[in-house]
Amino acid sequence: MASISTWFRYMAHKLEYSLTLSLKSHRSNKLSDRELIQIICKNLFYGKITYLHSDKGPEMSPTMTANENTLLIRKIPIANTRFVFIGDAVVLKDPNDSDKYLVRRLAAVEGFEMVSGDEKEEPFVLEKNQCWVTAENQELKAKEAYDSRTFGPVSTADIVGRAIYCLRTAVDHGPVRNSQTAMGQDSPILAVELDVDEMAKNHKA
């Protein structure tokens, strides 16, 4: 059971998420003050800031297996350097199919200079709101990995979450290694919202 201090930290993250998401909706939909307050309260008191996501494939080995994995994903209201960090295992829309989602490591963000191992390719700098994502499996070739080496930079707006826990099998599961900053932020969320039994029930063997 989570301690009182952990609950306070969890509620602080939940409040930040609720406010950020509600203000985002307000800017796009021009909500009334009453509607804005209702959404904030709904997200704060009734919603979760995590969800379950299934994924498989060799691209994220060893964090994930080639078989089915059930992931606990922390929702990201706005994908910027305040919420996601280099080294995080992020969930993003497939740049070639917006109905599908990928799990990849965030390798670089706007302002980073990207230098290819191929001398024929010119270095370039990631533009505003661009990021570079890579597969974790070092044994895969670039085309097999299906990451930014294949489809290029992606919009940070396409990042929807961060994987914080992975259930590979009923007896093989644990927290996902992310940046130190992210893992520190995610620890109270794991303490409160992680339900391994629920993950196991949703797991597709």
Swiss-Prot record:
Role: Catalyzes the removal of transit peptides required for the targeting of proteins from the mitochondrial matrix, across the inner membrane, into the inter-membrane space.
Superkingdom assignment: Eukaryota
Keyword Membrane carried by entry: yes
Similarity annotation: Belongs to the peptidase S26 family. IMP1 subfamily.
Subcellular location: Mitochondrion inner membrane
Protein name: Mitochondrial ATP-independent inner membrane protease subunit 2
Chief location of this protein within or outside the cell: mitochondrion
GO biological process assignments: signal peptide processing
Any GO MF annotation of the entry: serine-type endopeptidase activity
